[in-house]
Amino acid sequence: MALCARAALLLGVLQVLALLGAAQDPTDAQGSASGNHSVLTSNINITENTNQTMSVVSNQTSEMQSTAKPSVLPKTTTLITVKPATIVKISTPGVLPHVTPTASKSTPNASASPNSTHTSASMTTPAHSSLLTTVTVSATTHPTKGKGSKFDAGSFVGGIVLTLGVLSILYIGCKMYYSRRGIRYRSIDEHDAII
């Protein structure tokens, strides 16, 4: 749930920054000064270190008709490390959008590793004809391949030598202890003797 809130907050911050950038840049990508323009506000890719990738993409276009010089907002790409979540909800305040969720799970591609699985979910929210918000969440799992068990002869011989060394030190130590202690004979009392 916290991931959903962070994704929505990040999307809102990027939209505000994109609108501020539009107010400062006097020309658009074609260099024209007026007319109808589509504006791309943000493109967010969220990548996790555990080989699971989540992508949240928001393509928001709006129509501008004015005599002032409109500008195209810069395409922004941000990489953030997050924990994976299964549900993403984004709501537009003041507008009740029609939501069309789709989900797909595909088998591994030829370009992907043979054991990877790619799962994606997409949600399109058309609120007005000039506003389109798309949220895509996809997770790719790449299983880690272990090196496997490999016999190392050096470690085997080293372990045997180490064990024999420790045993020999213990044996020599015990021999020295008993030799220094000396032999203690006990005299047999007459009541201990068996006659």
Curated annotation (Swiss-Prot):
* Phosphoserine PTM sites in chain numbering: S187
Protein's name according to its UniProt entry:
Porimin
Q: What does this protein do?
A: Implicated in oncotic cell death, characterized by cell swelling, organelle swelling, vacuolization and increased membrane permeability.
Q: Where is the signal peptide, in residue numbers?
A: 1-23
Q: Residues on the Cytoplasmic side?
A: 174-195
- Cellular component terms per the entry's GO annotation: membrane
Q: Which residues are glycosylated?
A: N36, N45, N51, N59, N109, N115
Instruction: Tell me the organism.
Output: Mus musculus (Mouse)
Q: Name one Pfam family in it.
A: MGC-24
